[in-house]
């Protein structure tokens, strides 16, 4: 499986979040691509969210499954998340793209494209920290699917 993380904001390689994220990505057997885009500071409101949605979606293949991270999305356990990825694999999906929007959230264009709106809880997390949490959960899902003992119920 190929995993794409498409995010607004550029994370410096010297940032602790980047270093921690890399610890999980280096363990990942699946291919991983990160696409980062500059914030559109000149825009606001729906114009901003839709411009950012266009950027986030620009690097996503047409047939990819799209997961939009949003505080109002569906919450899944780690096993349920792994099961969702397995279902998509069994349906022939070879790419899953995760979208992390800007500070104002996602525009309707991104939400309409979503195969899953995913929430990691009702709290708002910093976008750079969310990348770490997502990387760990993708790695955890892979280990669950492989029967590796990393995940414990």
Regions found by a protein language model. Name each.
Residues 108-152:
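Structured adenosyl-cofactor binding patch, chiefly the S-adenosyl-L-methionine
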Residues 6-8, 35-37, 99:
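Short hydrophobic segments within beta-strands
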Residues 18-22, 53-54, 108-111:
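Short, surface-exposed alpha-helical segments at coil->helix boundaries
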Residues 2, 94-99:
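Loop/turn-to-beta-strand initiation segments
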Residues 5, 67, 101, 134:
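Conserved RecA-like P-loop NTPase ATPase core
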Residues 30-96:
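S-adenosyl-L-methionine/SAH cofactor-binding core of RNA-modifying enzymes
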Residues 1-28:
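N-terminal beta1-alpha1 ligand-phosphate binding loop
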Residues 11, 71-74, 102-105:
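Short glycine-rich anion-binding loops that position phosphate/pyrophosphate groups of nucleotides
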């Amino acid at each position: 499986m190929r995993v794409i993380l498409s995010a607004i904001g550029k994370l410096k390689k010297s940032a602790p979040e980047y270093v921690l994220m890399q610890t999980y990505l280096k363990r990942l057997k699946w291919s991983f691509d990160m696409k980062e885009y500059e914030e559109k500071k000149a825009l606001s409101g729906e114009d901003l969210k839709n411009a950012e949605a266009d950027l986030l979606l620009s690097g996503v293949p047409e047939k990819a499954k799209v997961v939009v991270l949003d505080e109002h999305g569906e919450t899944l356990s780690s096993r349920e998340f792994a099961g969702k990825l397995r279902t998509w694999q069994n349906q022939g999906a070879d790419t899953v793209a995760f979208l992390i929007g800007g500070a104002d959230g996602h525009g309707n264009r991104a939400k309409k494209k979503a195969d899953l709106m995913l929430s990691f809880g009702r709290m708002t997390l910093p976008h750079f920290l969310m990348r770490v949490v997502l990387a760990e959960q993708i790695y955890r899902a892979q280990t669950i699917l492989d029967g590796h003992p990393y995940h414990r119920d």
